[in-house]
Amino acid sequence: MLLNILDIQAKKGLEKIACLTAYTFPMARILDEHCDLILVGDSVGQTVYGMESTLSVTLDMMIAHGKAVVKARSKALVVVDMPFASYYTPELAYKNASRILSETGCDAVKLEGGVCVAEEIAFLVARGIPVMGHVGLMPQHFNQLGGYKCQGKTDSSRQHIKEDAKAVCEAGAFCVVLECISPSLAAELTQELPVPTIGIGASNACDGQILVVDDMLGQSSRYPKFVKRFADLEHTIKDAVVGYVRAVKCSEFPGDEHCYSDGPHLRVFRAHPHHAQ
């Protein structure tokens, strides 16, 4: 049964909400069985396309990856990030968010920002588009924030984040991501806000957690401090590639068990030449 935003909200204070990012059909199919929420994050720009930041990610890219993820899910709620500069007015936000929902079949969109995007969030929610908020460290704002740094360390910054989170909730966001803020601030916001908080580098005090799946799986040697690597796929993949190349060079692969024999199997192969492509 597909989860909806009410199911996610009902977990607040009762059951931790497990979230991960996904950008492809195979990965989403694996995550769907276990995760409550899958985010098609604009982090795809860095993890898949090798971009320096999320600022170059386009709406078409998000829609393409959103389609792939939605096709794989049978249970998890799917949220798609709205990319940089795609929601700087209420009308533009609605135009792009409605396209994301209609073309991907996802359940909600995510916007970064607090007070500055409250009007856009309210505009979308009033027109039937569920919104996930995102405050604290906001990757689309990294130039203004002076880089990827923990936020809320000063009294003024702490107050600013609290105002942002409150504005997002009052505008109608069904949950809010808290990124790279202190544990005490995360605990305070989780207690005060009426909607679930999803932490990333924001301590275990939040109602749920999210990580970039590539970081969690250890597919890169570079990852933030707040990431726990539950696997080491970078070395697993390297070992597999080395083994494959060695087997090819030594003529150990393909073996007889990987080859077609004369007879019916050969006729099938010739009738379906696309198998060789």
Curated annotation (Swiss-Prot):
It catalyses: 3-methyl-2-oxobutanoate + (6R)-5,10-methylene-5,6,7,8-tetrahydrofolate + H2O = 2-dehydropantoate + (6S)-5,6,7,8-tetrahydrofolate. Binds 1 Mg(2+) ion per subunit. It is found in: Cytoplasm. Mg(2+) binds at residues 42, 81, 112. The active site is at 179 (proton acceptor). One of its GO terms (biological process) is pantothenate biosynthetic process. It comes from the Bacteria. Gene3D superfamilies: Phosphoenolpyruvate-binding domains. Its cofactor is Mg(2+). 3-methyl-2-oxobutanoate binds at residues 42-43, 81, 110. Pfam families: Pantoate_transf. The keyword Metal-binding applies. One of its GO terms (cellular component) is cytoplasm. The keyword Metal-binding applies. Keywords: Cytoplasm, Magnesium, Metal-binding, Pantothenate biosynthesis, Transferase. Pathway: Cofactor biosynthesis; (R)-pantothenate biosynthesis; (R)-pantoate from 3-methyl-2-oxobutanoate: step 1/2. One of its GO terms (molecular function) is magnesium ion binding. Its EC number is 2.1.2.11. PANTHER family: 3-METHYL-2-OXOBUTANOATE HYDROXYMETHYLTRANSFERASE. Catalyzes the reversible reaction in which hydroxymethyl group from 5,10-methylenetetrahydrofolate is transferred onto alpha-ketoisovalerate to form ketopantoate. Belongs to the PanB family. NCBIfam families: panB, PRK00311.1. This is 3-methyl-2-oxobutanoate hydroxymethyltransferase. It comes from Anaplasma marginale (strain St. Maries). The gene is panB.
